Curated annotation (Swiss-Prot):
Protein name: DNA-directed RNA polymerase subunit gamma
Coiled coil: none
Annotated Zn(2+) binding sites: C70, C72, C85, C88
PANTHER family cross-referenced by the UniProt entry: DNA-DIRECTED RNA POLYMERASE (PTHR19376), DNA-DIRECTED RNA POLYMERASE SUBUNIT BETA (PTHR19376:SF54)
The family this protein is said to belong to: Belongs to the RNA polymerase beta' chain family. RpoC1 subfamily.
Cofactor note: Binds 1 Mg(2+) ion per subunit. Binds 1 Zn(2+) ion per subunit.
Organism: Gloeobacter violaceus (strain ATCC 29082 / PCC 7421)
Residues that hold Mg(2+) according to the record: D468, D470, D472
Gene responsible for this protein: rpoC1
InterPro entries in the record: DNA-dir_RpoC1_gamma, DNA-dir_RpoC_beta_prime, RNA_pol_asu, RNA_pol_N, RNA_pol_Rpb1_1, RNA_pol_Rpb1_3, RNA_pol_Rpb1_3_sf, RNA_pol_Rpb1_clamp_domain
Keyword Nucleotide-binding (UniProt): no
GO molecular function: DNA binding; DNA-directed RNA polymerase activity; magnesium ion binding; zinc ion binding
Domain of life of the native organism: Bacteria
Any Gene Ontology biological process: DNA-templated transcription
């Protein structure tokens, strides 16, 4: 595929016109022959195992199956690059063009696009201002729609007629004393009728009329008008025509995107799309032949309906009617199934690509970590930071080349861990938890090597990640360049993301175990009597006594304290004074739990 040099700002998805669909697949050969239309349902010849000409894998349309080799074998090797074989019409080029060259199927009768007919909302019924049920009846040949009422008094534009009503009006036209004048094709059924109705819409004038009606309407009618106007405005803005929602040609995607591969036993495995395309081509060819021999209307009509259903199944199998199934009664995967959903092309392959220097594991709580740290399993770290470790090993002279360094890592040599420790110091990693719904769903941390296979996460950042420890997994990414490392450290480090970008309020707040722990340390418990009333000269003495089991965590004790004390209860404070009234010592009533709580806060404030 030629490399695109020009830069672009965005990609726009819009409806393709029939001319554009054909232009995607059409090419003119040097001899003037135009190729691109797929006319045969065959895939490959069962004897030669070569693609059939004008079939779904045709080399003339899609390019050669082998690099630099035409179909008939007249031209081989790269020196014939760009030559089109006079005998078989295949261009001598790389086989990878079969990944992007398209074809098309010219339909013998128009068919509606099932997305625009059966989608929610149905754009075809919205634009035509007709109920979806009525539009479906016309499309699937259950009713006629009046396209030109002529001078008939009991007929009006877009009126639905049953078969009997249509025959009755036809009889009136050909009656001897009839004054009824109706043009040929005054009523039709099928996608052809919908195509004519959509083509008759003058978008600008219709939009103006709707805007005028909006001022006078209320309630449900107004809502309906707004919906129609919005669709019309979008068509006008994109330069699309409503009749393009009815297909007269359908694109055939490149053959390498719907491959056919030979299995060990000589059988073939093929993409479901090939079966769906084959159904469309078979029915299309049969319809063309029936029209050629002027078959009865009822037979042609039935074939048109079957063609409509085949195209529906190709675009979105199961959206309407019976689901087309293959072997083992398995529903065939249509184009929509390939695109949509979690396993679809966009979410699986385009938005969610696998990247190098990344890994994922289950998260567990790391209560001893600092806010900006995360525990990274050694097994994962050595794999993620392998290029840096190899570079450092060679730099230190421990090994001479990359191969030797890799062998050293595989042997789990004890020396690699000190090197790894040096490498990860100051090198932040990014942690991401899906779904990343806001920017705090991915944050930077300084890795700390831990044993085990789980990533350790600081409990305070759980709110930002919406994480809990019931089996959640997180992905680790290593920023490689110095710029990305600096950006991660300055902008994305967890300790720099204290406030929520949505509300501006703190998002790093104590929850669950932390709140319970703080409450338990500082709560009053009258039942805790062991060691109650004892005096201690320092907080360290009190904690030692608790550790030795001499006092309870919640027992009321007296602690010597030299600072200023504010209390609502004078009984919680005891001061010893000398004869002159000067304070000799001061004791406050507290608990060991409150002493521990106070110590932790004091240490944190001093450290910061």
């Amino acid at each position: 595929m030629p490399r695109m040099e020009q830069r672009f700002d965005y990609i726009k998805i819009s409806i393709a016109s029939p001319e554009r669909v054909m232009a995607w697949g059409q090419r003119t050969l040097p001899n003037g022959q135009v190729v691109g239309e797929v006319t045969k349902p065959e895939t490959i010849n069962y004897r030669t195992l070569k693609p059939e000409m004008d079939g779904l894998f045709c080399e003339r349309i899609f390019g050669p199956s082998k690099d630099w080799e035409c179909y008939c074998g007249k031209y081989k090797r790269v020196r014939h690059r760009g030559i089109v074989c006079e005998r078989c019409g295949v261009e001598v080029t790389e086989s990878k063009v079969r990944r992007h060259r398209m074809g098309y199927i010219k339909l013998a009768a128009p068919v509606t696009h099932v997305w625009y007919l059966k989608g929610i909302p149905s754009y075809i019924s919205t634009l035509l201002d007709m109920p979806l049920r009525d539009v479906e009846q016309v499309v699937y040949f259950n009713a006629y729609v009046v396209l030109n009422p002529g001078n008939a008094e009991n007929l009006y534009y877009k009126q639905l007629l049953t078969e009997d009503q249509y025959i009755e009006v036809e009889d009136q036209i050909f009656a001897e004393d009839s004054s009824l004048e109706l043009p040929e094709g005054w009523a039709k059924m099928g996608a052809e009728a919908i195509h004519e109705l959509l083509a008759a819409i003058e978008m600008e004038s219709e939009a103006e009329r709707l805007r005028a009606d909006l001022g006078e309407s209320k309630g449900q009618k107004r809502t309906k008008l707004i919906k129609r106007l919005r669709v019309l405005d979008n068509f006008i803005a994109t330069g699309s025509r409503p009749e393009w929602m009815v297909l007269t040609a359908i694109p055939v995607i490149p053959p390498d995107l719907r491959p056919m591969v030979q299995l060990d036993g000589g059988r073939f495995a093929t993409s479901d799309l090939n079966d769906l395309y084959r159904r469309v081509i078979n029915r299309n060819n049969r319809l063309a032949r029936l029209q050629e021999i002027l078959a009865p209307e009822i037979i042609v009509r039935n074939e048109k309906r079957m063609l409509q259903e085949a195209v529906d199944a190709l675009i979105d199998n199961g959206r309407r009617g019976r689901t087309v199934v293959g072997a083992n009664n398995r529903p065939l995967k249509s184009l929509s199934d390939i695109i949509e959903g979690k396993q679809g092309r966009f979410r699986q392959n385009l938005l969610g690509k696998r990247v190098d220097y990344s890994g994922r594991s289950v998260i567990v709580v790391g209560p001893k970590l600092k806010l900006h740290q995360c525990g990274l399993p050694k097994e994962m770290a050595i794999e993620l930071f392998q290029p840096f470790v190899i570079h450092k090993l060679i730099q230190r002279g421990l090994v001479n080349n990359i191969k030797a360094a890799k062998k050293m890592i595989q042997r789990n040599d004890a020396r690699i861990w000190s090197v790894l420790d040096e490498v990860i110091t100051g090198h932040p990693v990014l942690l991401n938890r899906a779904p990343t719904l806001h920017r705090l769903g991915i944050q930077a941390f300084e890795p700390i090597l831990v044993s085990g296979r789980a990533i350790q996460l600081h409990p305070l950042v759980c709110t930002a990640f919406n994480a809990d420890f019931d089996g959640d997994q997180m992905a680790v990414h290593v920023p490689l360049s110095l710029e990305s490392q600096a950006e991660a450290r300055l902008l994305m480090l967890a300790s720099n993301n204290v406030l929520s970008p949505a509300t501006g309020r703190p998002i790093i707040t104590p929850t669950q175990d932390m709140v319970l722990g703080c409450y338990y340390l500082t709560v009053d418990n009258p039942d805790a009597t062991k060691g109650s009333g004892k005096y201690f000269g320092s907080s360290e003495d009190a904690v030692i006594a608790y550790n030795q089991g001499m006092i309870d965590l919640h027992a009321k004790i007296w602690l010597r304290f030299e600072g200023e004390v504010e209390t609502d209860n004078p009984e919680d404070l005891r001061v010893r004074r000398d004869e002159q009234g000067n304070a000799l010592s001061q004791f406050v009533r507290t608990t060991v739990g409150r002493i521990i709580f106070n110590q932790v806060i004091q240490e944190t404030l001093v450290a910061s």
